[in-house]
Amino acid sequence: MSNTFTQLYVHVVFATKVRMNLIKPEYQKQVYEYIAGIIKHSGSHPILINGMTDHVHLLFRYKADCNLSSLVRDIKSGISGHINKNGWVAGKFEWQSGYGAFS
């Protein structure tokens, strides 16, 4: 499909398990940078990543052949592992199941 051009933008929102305030300001920047890396690795382009202590907002341009559900799964899984590995929360960090996506 050499004559095809797409620009697909999506706003994704997801929250911590039971909306607990676990994404502390001390490491929010590192969390957002890690998420940006996962998005870039997928071939998509992060535009803005931000949030609060209990949820995250992502705005990115994604490739037409990108599976959004798989990408969000990879982001949530990757950042959970990163937070747990660094010991930034007492106990186990988890996300709520599901997400919102708007284009």
What are these regions (language model features)?
Residues 1-103:
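Basic nucleic-acid-binding interfaces
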